Amino acid sequence: MNKFAIVLAAGKGTRMKSALPKVLHQVAGKSMLAHVLKSVSEVEIAKNVVIVGHEADRVIATLPKGTQFVKQVEQLGTGHAVRIAADLLANEEGATLVIAGDTPLITGETLGALFDYHFAQKATATILTAIAPNPTGYGRIIRDEKGSVEKIVEQKDANDFEKSITEINTGTYIFDNKSLFKALTEITTDNAQGEYYLTDVIEIFKKAGQTIAAHILDDFDESLGVNDRVALSQAEGTMRKRINHEHMVNGVTLIDPATTYIDSEVTIGAETVIEANVTIKGNTFIGKNVLITNGSRIENSEIHSNCEVRNSTVEESRMSVGSNVGPYAHLRPGTVLSEEVHVGNFVEIKGSTLGKGTKAGHLTYIGNATVGEKVNFGAGTITANFDGKNKFNTEIDDFAFIGSNSTIIAPLHIGKNALTAAGSVVTEDVPDEAVEIGRGKQVNKLGRAKKMPHYRGQ
């Protein structure tokens, strides 16, 4: 049987107190809507329709290519939101999943089990329910004396007895598609909110003698709907625990999972060790047997096997096998370290490629440079690559030795096996195997110090 999906992403999210549409707030580096769409994609959906409304264009811009969407111009309730998908889905034969775009913790495994249960029960509607420790704010599942689902009552419409019920509606359903769209033509706004409730179709089905099933979630956390920043932080914490657990099961050592923040799209190889207070974000790849020490931050980068990142920041950069950085180094966007490169204390590199075995041990800035193999940078080396308007490139060939406190005024080229003397200001190309000395001659003026303000006498 064909499977369809409707993802509800039209709400403003007033309680978020944000200019950003609620479904675009991020959990573990990815929008809540993106998490939901990923889970939906795991159950072989034939047609997926996203309902957009508030800030529709911003939401549409984030959708995967080819995703169908419908704009809900007026937010008149969940029933209305589903009904406006009729032109795309009403005539289809099959089962339709309806899910909110602010439920980032729901898994593809759960959705697959929900479809299986729906088909096994031969139901017209199947509700994903959960037993809530505190059901306040949720719609309650009302069952008859035989235990069958009778209806769903929203919090604002519930009486005291109904409010005491702990089985709640998670807001995720599967319906027989044609039955759903027929029932949606019968719902009204006769309720406390003055809205078209999707949940009213359950009562319509029940009165028609159709089968209503309820599948109870094993993990209540999956049902979390995010309506404010408190719930957003709860979702973030739960997702982080889930992500960290998966990495540890796959052979990654996390010294302190409670202070380790790893985004959902990060890949990490076995035998890697990650110390406390580490943040790894975006589409980052980390290979096998990597050490990442306390306080490091890595974002959208590739760190290949046997590398070390010690108390450092790596952004949009690539570290090849066996290279190491830190402590307190900063690889800025566009940096590429070849194999066995060493970048040490207080070194900043941007938009540069360093060849195999090159070393920049301390207190160095390398920007817009192409550096060969086994080049040595002395402490205090600066590539002066910016004149206030334009950036300029520096080329340094294999085996060059850059003396301490050298200032390299780009654009220029330093040849193979060349050497710059310590303290040089390099303003011209340096040929292969040449020694460059670009500093003023030292002059000692004997006795002159006695006339200087610092002088303290014998």
UniProtKB/Swiss-Prot annotation:
> From what superkingdom does this record's organism come?
Bacteria
Give the record's subunit note: Homotrimer.
Q: What is this protein called?
A: Bifunctional protein GlmU
* Protein transport found in the keyword field: no
Biological role stated in the UniProt entry = Catalyzes the last two sequential reactions in the de novo biosynthetic pathway for UDP-N-acetylglucosamine (UDP-GlcNAc). The C-terminal domain catalyzes the transfer of acetyl group from acetyl coenzyme A to glucosamine-1-phosphate (GlcN-1-P) to produce N-acetylglucosamine-1-phosphate (GlcNAc-1-P), which is converted into UDP-GlcNAc by the transfer of uridine 5-monophosphate (from uridine 5-triphosphate), a reaction catalyzed by the N-terminal domain.
Name the Pfam families for this protein.
NTP_transferase
Q: Which UniProt keywords apply?
A: Acyltransferase, Cell shape, Cell wall biogenesis/degradation, Cytoplasm, Magnesium, Metal-binding, Multifunctional enzyme, Nucleotidyltransferase, Peptidoglycan synthesis, Repeat, Transferase
Residues holding Mg(2+):
102, 227
Q: What is its main location?
A: cytoplasm
Q: Name one GO biological process term.
A: cell wall organization
Where is it localised? Cytoplasm
Note down the stretches annotated as region N-acetyltransferase: 251-458
Q: GO terms for molecular function, please?
A: glucosamine-1-phosphate N-acetyltransferase activity; magnesium ion binding; UDP-N-acetylglucosamine diphosphorylase activity
Entry cofactor note text? Binds 1 Mg(2+) ion per subunit.
| Classification via InterPro entries | Bifunctional_GlmU, GlmU-like, GlmU_C_LbH, NTP_transferase_dom, Nucleotide-diphossugar_trans, Trimer_LpxA-like_sf
> Catalytic site residues?
362 (proton acceptor)
The entry's UDP-N-acetyl-alpha-D-glucosamine-binding residues are 8-11, 22, 72, 77-78, 139, 154, 169, 227, 332, 350, 365, 376
Family, similarity comment: In the N-terminal section; belongs to the N-acetylglucosamine-1-phosphate uridyltransferase family. In the C-terminal section; belongs to the transferase hexapeptide repeat family.
Catalyses: alpha-D-glucosamine 1-phosphate + acetyl-CoA = N-acetyl-alpha-D-glucosamine 1-phosphate + CoA + H(+); N-acetyl-alpha-D-glucosamine 1-phosphate + UTP + H(+) = UDP-N-acetyl-alpha-D-glucosamine + diphosphate
Which cofactors, by name?
Mg(2+)
GO cellular component terms, A-Z: cytoplasm; membrane
From which lineage does this chain's organism come? Bacteria, Bacillati, Bacillota, Bacilli, Lactobacillales
